[in-house]
Curated annotation (Swiss-Prot):
Compartments, as annotated in UniProt: Mitochondrion membrane
Note: There are three genes which encode the mitochondrial ATP synthase proteolipid and they specify precursors with different import sequences. They are expressed in a tissue-specific manner.
Gene Ontology cellular-component annotations: cation channel complex; mitochondrial membrane; proton-transporting ATP synthase complex; proton-transporting two-sector ATPase complex, proton-transporting domain
PANTHER family, per the entry: ATP SYNTHASE F(0) COMPLEX SUBUNIT C3, MITOCHONDRIAL, ATP SYNTHASE LIPID-BINDING PROTEIN, MITOCHONDRIAL
Disease: This protein is the major protein stored in the storage bodies of animals or humans affected with ceroid lipofuscinosis (Batten disease).
Disulfide-linked positions: none
Domain of life, source organism: Eukaryota
GO biological process: pore complex assembly; proton motive force-driven ATP synthesis; response to 3,3',5-triiodo-L-thyronine; response to ethanol
Biological source species: Rattus norvegicus (Rat)
Annotated site (Reversibly protonated during proton transport): E124
Protein name listed in UniProt: ATP synthase F(0) complex subunit C2, mitochondrial
Stated role: Mitochondrial membrane ATP synthase (F(1)F(0) ATP synthase or Complex V) produces ATP from ADP in the presence of a proton gradient across the membrane which is generated by electron transport complexes of the respiratory chain. F-type ATPases consist of two structural domains, F(1) - containing the extramembraneous catalytic core and F(0) - containing the membrane proton channel, linked together by a central stalk and a peripheral stalk. During catalysis, ATP synthesis in the catalytic domain of F(1) is coupled via a rotary mechanism of the central stalk subunits to proton translocation.
Length: 141
């Protein structure tokens, strides 16, 4: 009983366990197991690595993992598509401001119209950029 309690409460076991759990997953998978070096463990006949006492975490390549990746892809594409609605709101704001400006000062008709076309082009370009990002997320990743 004394040997078992000494084995469980060994400082090196606690230290290596906490180091193992605090390391990233790739380091846990790729690092070779360490052999115990404490003198208190020498009374045990079977020597096993300290990392074998903790269940090994493995990379997830299951169907659930792929479903999560697909859902994240759709969520990202949907969030990028929201920018297209912002483009529509921008175009409406540009032409609404054109009408208000023309009503206030009809003599600036040509200058206001050229600025409205510039605002329309910039807003439409941002909308197309958002749509392109959405398609890249869906089909290129």
């Amino acid at each position: 009983m004394y040997a078992c309690s000494k084995f469980v409460s060994t400082r090196s076991l606690i230290r290596s366990t906490s180091q193992l759990l605090s390391r990233p997953l790739s380091a846990v998978e790729l690092k070779r197991p360490q052999m115990p070096t404490d003198e208190g463990l020498s009374c045990l006949a079977v020597r096993r690595p300290l990392t074998s006492l903790i269940p090994s975490r493995s990379f997830q390549t299951s169907a659930i993992s792929r479903d999560i990746d697909t859902a994240a892809k759709f969520i990202g594409a949907g969030a990028a598509t929201v920018g297209v609605a912002g483009s529509g709101a921008g175009i409406g704001t540009v032409f609404g401001s054109l009408i208000i400006g023309y009503a206030r000062n009809p003599s600036l008709k040509q200058q206001l119209f050229s600025y409205a076309i510039l605002g329309f082009a910039l807003s439409e370009a941002m909308g197309l950029f958002c749509l392109m990002v959405a398609f890249l997320i869906l089909f290129a990743m």
